[in-house]
A protein has these predicted regions:
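Extreme N-terminal leader/targeting segments of oxidoreductases
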Residues: 1-14, 33
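N-terminal Rossmann-like FAD-binding beta1-loop-alpha1 element of flavoenzymes
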Residues: 13-39
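Short hydrophobic core segments
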Residues: 16-18, 208-220, 361
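Active-site substrate-recognition segment that forms the wall
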Residues: 29-33, 43, 55-56, 61, ...
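Dinucleotide-binding Rossmann-like beta1-alpha1 core, especially the glycine-rich loop
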Residues: 56-138, 305
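Short beta-strand to alpha-helix junction loop
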Residues: 72-75, 107-116, 154-173, 292-297
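Helical element adjacent to the flavin cofactor pocket in flavoenzyme catalytic cores
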Residues: 154-204, 208-212
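C-terminal catalytic lobe of FAD-dependent flavoproteins
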Residues: 309-394
Length: 394
């Protein structure tokens, strides 16, 4: 059954997407591609966490205990990336989003790290994933800039990368090309009519009516006024500081693939771009809405990266940024309908927003056109938190 009632409201559209980061943009683009009249509201579309993110597509390397349910979603989305990149290029006159099938190397610097990596390797094998254990010498043969003290590592040839800034720009262009109407203003309040989401009022007073509303505002998704308390998106901001350096021609190639490690319990990664940029990240800080780049954050990232790749201290530091990841209570995304008819969520992607972009767009477009959430997304419905919510509001 087609779930949208086309043009039913004043200024009516089929779909209103609130939020213009990569998740909101991909949702709007895919909805428009399926023939839905789509409107998007965001004061700075293409901005948000994607401007800070490193762009690792690493479902295998980022596998964590207790998060195995996310694995299938991540693998399915990573598998879609080559075709997704090609479709975006077709839609935007050849835009390159920096998709690079370069692989990932996760390394250990001491005995504890080595044990941790061995356990990760065992978990990967139990999940049927492809990864190869390497000695320290084999790691350095692959990446000669690694520190002499590297004790071993995991080579994952299927974990790749994309440039999130290029991705965001391409998605914005694709939306414009597909006829999405973009209001460069924030949504201030959800409109609810007859116990159904019916659109939103923008900061400038504009009223947008729509048959279906998708809340895809990242870490801000829980702050929209007018949303009934029982369906407020349970997301929190998690700060991440990230550095960007430049690899001069004399030092190239500095790294040929993404390199990751756990250093003193903190995760650090180095993502080399083909244009000579090297992205180093990321801190993970539960500090509310603070996006200050701190001396301590920069120091910790450079210190850990230096232990991994000592030559990094010779590179020019070109940018420091901090962004906010949208974390849900179980750190898995919120995809699909809420208990308020007409209101859907596409948020809470936490560390996996870039990775899950292709699949999120596909899943949300299917929901918006058929009223059915695809099976792969059903474990991530916002309704998984409804029972606990109802108890707390009782």
């Amino acid at each position: 059954m087609h779930s949208s009632r086309k043009g039913s409201g004043r200024n009516g559209s089929d779909v209103l997407v609130i939020g213009g980061g990569i998740i909101g943009l991909v949702t709007a683009w895919q909805a428009a591609r399926r023939g839905l009249r789509t409107v998007l509201a965001d004061p700075a579309p293409g901005g948000g966490a994607a401007q800070v993110a490193a762009g690792m597509l690493a479902p295998v390397t980022e596998l964590h205990y207790g998060e195995e349910s996310l694995l299938g979603l991540g693998l399915a989305s990573a598998e879609r990336y080559p075709q997704f990149a090609a479709e975006l290029a077709d839609a935007t006159g050849g835009t390159d989003i920096g998709y690079r099938a370069c692989g990932t190397l996760a390394v250990a610097l001491d005995a504890d790290d080595r044990l941790h990596l061995r356990e990760l390797h065992a978990l990967q094998r139990r999940c049927g994933l492809e990864s190869e254990w390497l000695t320290g010498r084999e790691c350095r043969r692959l990446e000669p800039m690694l520190a002499p003290g590297v004790r071993g590592g995991l080579r994952v040839d299927g974990d790749h990368q994309v440039d999130p800034r290029r991705l965001a720009a391409a998605l914005l262009a694709a939306c414009e090309g597909a006829g999405v109407t973009i209001h460069r203003t924030a949504a201030e309040r959800l409109l609810v009519t007859a116990d159904r989401a019916a659109g939103a009022v923008l900061d400038d007073g504009t009223e947008l009516r729509a048959d279906q509303v998708v809340l895809a505002a990242g870490s801000l998704s829980g702050r929209l006024a007018g949303v009934p308390p029982e369906v407020v998106a349970p997301v929190r901001p998690v700060k991440g500081q990230v550095l960007r350096l430049t690899v001069p021609a004399a030092y190239a190639p500095f790294l040929s693939r993404t390199v990751r490690a756990v250093v003193r319990g903190s995760h650090v990664y180095l993502v080399p771009r083909e244009n000579g940029e090297l992205v180093v990240g990321a801190t993970s800080e539960e500090l509310g809405w603070d996006t200050t780049v701190t001396a301590g954050g920069v120091y910790e990232l450079l210190r850990d990266a230096h232990e991994l790749v000592p030559g990094i201290t010779e590179l020019p530091l070109t940018e420091t940024r901090a962004g906010l990841r949208p974390g849900s209570p179980d750190n898995a995304p919120l995809l699909g309908p809420t208990d308020l008819p007409g209101l859907h969520l596409a948020t809470g992607h936490y560390r996996n927003g870039v990775l899950l972009t292709p699949l999120t767009g596909e899943v949300m477009a299917e929901l918006l056109t058929t009223g059915e959430l695809p099976d792969i997304a059903r474990p991530f419905t916002p309704r998984r938190f409804s029972a606990a919510r109802q108890e707390s509001f009782a």
